[in-house]
Amino acid sequence: MVVRELFSGQLVRTWISGELSTPCPIPLGRDILYVAYFATAELKCHLALGWPLPTNVLDLFVEFRCQTNGKLLPSGNGLLGALIYFGLSAIAYTEKEAMRKLAIRGGPFSICERCELTDYCQGDVDALVELLPYLTKI
């Protein structure tokens, strides 16, 4: 799991093995805005781990679809497509697919695979930070 607090820049990188006893490593109170891209995945993770759901969720996928609904999107409406649409840097599709396949394969993961997956997650988090001003007035 990788989380960045937007205003301080503080970064939290932690490996969560999926045990229900793992406490949620981030605050989720009413004063917190939880930003994700296609937030359903993150929210399902919270439920699977027995964590509370965040009170305030901003899904940049929804915001991107609101801005682009009805437009031709040659790179799609996923995170990579949104980054490309706004001219932002994005990892290669093949690299993203390789990491997704590794995550879907499931564990056990080697130490190297854990680092690769955490780096991949951080890349998505960093991309959200770059994308946020294009989709909101925050």
Regions found by a protein language model. Give the residues of each.
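Active-site-proximal helix-loop-helix substrate-binding element of RNase H-like nuclease domains
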Residues: 7-23, 31-136
